C-alpha cells in the first residue's frame, strides 16, 4: 500500500508583477537552510504560549467579496494547518471556493517528506502560471514544509516568479499580514522563520466535517532520523498544555463530534518538554477516557517513546481505540542504527509483545522504507521477516527518497534503483497477502462502524470505519451518516470490508 496524497480545497486574492532581483537578502534576515548542527542546539530559546489571537481592526472585512482556495499535500498535520488557515480566511471575510478559476487567492500547503510530493507542487505551480497570466490580481502562495527548505524557496524565486508569497510552518497566525503585504507589494513576500516556533492557542478553524476532528497536542520533532527533514521544517518538540487540549476536545464533544485524532510529529514525546509538571501522553489519554466522546486516536508514534504507562492506559479501553500506527521503517537493527531510529529490532518486537499483551485485539499498522543507502539483501529480508512476525494489518511502504540537508542525503549508495523497486514489489506483495488474510477474519463478525458518508465509488452505499480503522461499505439510510452503527461483515477485500446493517445507531455511554 503506497502513500495516498490527501487533497483539500478552500481559498483568496490580489498582487502585482515582480522584477528580477537578488533574493539572498531574504534568507540572511529570516531564513536559514536545514542544518543538523544548528538544529541540535535547541532549547536555548523559550517557547512562548500565545492565547490572544485576534484580528486587528484594520483587517475587519479585509476579504469581503473575495474567495480563497487551499490545496493540501501530505500528512494530517498539514490538513489541520489548512483548517486553521481556512478559519483565518473566513474570519477575514473571505469565502471558500473549490475551483482555482474562481479564487482570488490560491495557497499550496506543501509537504517535504518525499521528492514526489515536491514534484507535484512544482507541477501545480506551472499550471497556475497560465491562470496568473489571465488574472494578474490573483494571489498565489506556497506555505508548509517545503517553504522551510532554502533550496526549494530559491527554486520558487528563480523559476516561479508568479508566486506572490512564501511562508512556513511557524507563522500561520501571521497570514493576515502576509496577505496584506503580498497584495500591495511588487516583490514576492517571503516570511519563513528559522526560529523553532511557539504554541499559538485560540486560532480559528474551519473543520472539514462535523463527525471527526484533528486536535494538535504537540508540534515538532527532536529525533533527527538521518533520512527525515521534519525536525528542520517543523522545529523542536513543544507540547500544548493539557488543560487546553482537554477543553478543546470537550468543546468538540459538546458540538456532536464522535471521533478525535490527536496529532503530533511524535505524539509519544508529548509532555517531555514540560518543566513544571511530570505529564505524558499516557496521562493525557487517561484523562480523555473521561470525556464523553466515542473514540480517541493518536498519530504518529515513535517506538522509542512508547512507554509502559501509555500501554497500561490504552489497555483500559473505553473510548481509546485498539488501532496503533507504529512506524518501524526497517526490520534490521543495523539499518535502524544508520537511520538513527535509536531502537533495535529486538526492542521493537518486545514493544509489540507488550502492546498485544495489554490489548489482545490491537491492530498494528506501520511505515517501511526500502532501498535505504547500502541496504543489503539480508537486511531487507530482516524487514520481511519482522513484518510476518508482528503480523501487521497493513503498511505504508516507500522507496527511500533523499532529502537535501539530511545526513542520509550525503551517504553513498550502491543499491541500484531496479533492486529497490524489486524489493518494494516484494514487500507490497507481502503487505497485500497479510491484509486480505487479516480482513478475512472479520467475515461473519459484527463490528461497530462510525458512518462517514457516501462511498466514493457508489453514492447508494455508505462507508465508515471500525475502531481498528477498517473501511466498511454497506447499504443503509443516509440518515445514519455521523452515527455509530452495528454492521455484520459479509465480504472482505484487501483494503476494505463489505457488510449489512444489523442495528440502529448506538448510544455513546
From Swiss-Prot:
Its cofactor is [4Fe-4S] cluster. One of its GO terms (molecular function) is metal ion binding. It is an enzyme of class 2 (transferase). Residues 1-23 are annotated as: Disordered. Residues 66-184 form the MTTase N-terminal domain. Residues 1-15 have a biased composition (Polar residues). InterPro entries: Elp3/MiaA/NifB-like_rSAM, Methylthiotransferase, Methylthiotransferase_CS, Methylthiotransferase_N, Methylthiotransferase_N_sf, MiaB_methiolase, rSAM, rSAM_horseshoe. It catalyses: N(6)-dimethylallyladenosine(37) in tRNA + (sulfur carrier)-SH + AH2 + 2 S-adenosyl-L-methionine = 2-methylsulfanyl-N(6)-dimethylallyladenosine(37) in tRNA + (sulfur carrier)-H + 5'-deoxyadenosine + L-methionine + A + S-adenosyl-L-homocysteine + 2 H(+). The keyword 4Fe-4S applies. [4Fe-4S] cluster 2 binds at residues 221, 225, 228. Residues 440-503 form the TRAM domain. [4Fe-4S] cluster 1 binds at residues 75, 111, 145. Gene3D superfamilies: Methylthiotransferase, N-terminal domain (3.40.50.12160), tm_1862 like domain (3.80.30.20). Keywords: 4Fe-4S, Cytoplasm, Iron, Iron-sulfur, Metal-binding, S-adenosyl-L-methionine, Transferase, tRNA processing. Its main location: cytoplasm. GO terms for cellular component: cytosol. Binds 2 [4Fe-4S] clusters. One cluster is coordinated with 3 cysteines and an exchangeable S-adenosyl-L-methionine. Its EC number is 2.8.4.3. It is found in: Cytoplasm. Residues 207-437 form the Radical SAM core domain. Monomer. Catalyzes the methylthiolation of N6-(dimethylallyl)adenosine (i(6)A), leading to the formation of 2-methylthio-N6-(dimethylallyl)adenosine (ms(2)i(6)A) at position 37 in tRNAs that read codons beginning with uridine. PANTHER family: CDK5 REGULATORY SUBUNIT-ASSOCIATED PROTEIN 1, MITOCHONDRIAL TRNA METHYLTHIOTRANSFERASE CDK5RAP1. Belongs to the methylthiotransferase family. MiaB subfamily. This is tRNA-2-methylthio-N(6)-dimethylallyladenosine synthase. It comes from Bacillus anthracis.
Amino acid at each position: 500500500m503506497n502513500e495516498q496524497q490527501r487533497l483539500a480545497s478552500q481559498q483568496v486574492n490580489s498582487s502585482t508583477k515582480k522584477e528580477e532581483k537578488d533574493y539572498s537578502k531574504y534568507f540572511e534576515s529570516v531564513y536559514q537552510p536545514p542544518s543538523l548542527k544548528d538544529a541540535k542546539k535547541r532549547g536555548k530559546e523559550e517557547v512562548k504560549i500565545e492565547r490572544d489571537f485576534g484580528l486587528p481592526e484594520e483587517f475587519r472585512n479585509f476579504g469581503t467579496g473575495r474567495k480563497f482556495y487551499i490545496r493540501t499535500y501530505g500528512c494530517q498535520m498539514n490538513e489541520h494547518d489548512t483548517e486553521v488557515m481556512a478559519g483565518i480566511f473566513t474570519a477575514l471575510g473571505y469565502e471558500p471556493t473549490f475551483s482555482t478559476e474562481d479564487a482570488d487567492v490560491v495557497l499550496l500547503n506543501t509537504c517535504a517528506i518525499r521528492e514526489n510530493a515536491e514534484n507535484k507542487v512544482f507541477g501545480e505551480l506551472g499550471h497556475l502560471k497560465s491562470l496568473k497570466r489571465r488574472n494578474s490580481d490573483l494571489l498565489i502562495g506556497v506555505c508548509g514544509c517545503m517553504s522551510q527548505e532554502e533550496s526549494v524557496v530559491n527554486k520558487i524565486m528563480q523559476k516561479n516568479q508568479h508566486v506572490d508569497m512564501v511562508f512556513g510552518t511557524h507563522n500561520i497566525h501571521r497570514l493576515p499580514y502576509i496577505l496584506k503585504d503580498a497584495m500591495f507589494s511588487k516583490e514576492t513576500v517571503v516570511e519563513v522563520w528559522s526560529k523553532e516556533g511557539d504554541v499559538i492557542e485560540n486560532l480559528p478553524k474551519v473543520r472539514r466535517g462535523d463527525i471527526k476532528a484533528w486536535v494538535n497536542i504537540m508540534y515538532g520533532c527532536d529525533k533527527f532520523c538521518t533520512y527525515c527533514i521534519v525536525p528542520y521544517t517543523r522545529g523542536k518538540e513543544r507540547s500544548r498544555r493539557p488543560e487546553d487540549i482537554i477543553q478543546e476536545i470537550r468543546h468538540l464533544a459538546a458540538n456532536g463530534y464522535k471521533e478525535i485524532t490527536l496529532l503530533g510529529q511524535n505524539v509519544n514525546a508529548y509532555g517531555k518538554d514540560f518543566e513544571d509538571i511530570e505529564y505524558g501522553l499516557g496521562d493525557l489519554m487517561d484523562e480523555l477516557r473521561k470525556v464523553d466522546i466515542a473514540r480517541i486516536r493518536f498519530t504518529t508514534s515513535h517506538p522509542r517513546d512508547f512507554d509502559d504507562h501509555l500501554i497500561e492506559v490504552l489497555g483500559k479501553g473505553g473510548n481509546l481505540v485498539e488501532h496503533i500506527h507504529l512506524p518501524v521503517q526497517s526490520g534490521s537493527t543495523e539499518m535502524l542504527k544508520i537511520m538513527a531510529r535509536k531502537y533495535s529490532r529486538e526492542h521493537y518486537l518486545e514493544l509489540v509483545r507488550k502492546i498485544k499483551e495489554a490489548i489482545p485485539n490491537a491492530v498494528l499498522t506501520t511505515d517501511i522504507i526500502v532501498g535505504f543507502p547500502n541496504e543489503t539483501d539480508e537486511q531487507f529480508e530482516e524487514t520481511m521477516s519482522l513484518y510476518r512476525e508482528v503480523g501487521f494489518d497493513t503498511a505504508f511502504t516507500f522507496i527511500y527518497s533523499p532529502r537535501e540537508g539530511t545526513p542520509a542525503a550525503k551517504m553513498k549508495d550502491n543499491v541500484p534503483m531496479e533492486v529497490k523497486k524489486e524489493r518494494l514489489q516484494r514487500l507490497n506483495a507481502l503487505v497485500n497477502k497479510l491484509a486480505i488474510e487479516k480482513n478475512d477474519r472479520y467475515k461473519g463478525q459484527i463490528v461497530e462502524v462510525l458512518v462517514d458518508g457516501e462511498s466514493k465509488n457508489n453514492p447508494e452505499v455508505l462507508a465508515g470505519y471500525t475502531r481498528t480503522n477498517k473501511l466498511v461499505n454497506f447499504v443503509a439510510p443516509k440518515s445514519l451518516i455521523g452515527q455509530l452503527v452495528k454492521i455484520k461483515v459479509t465480504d472482505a477485500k484487501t483494503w476494505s470490508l463489505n457488510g449489512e446493517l444489523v442495528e440502529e445507531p448506538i448510544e455513546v455511554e
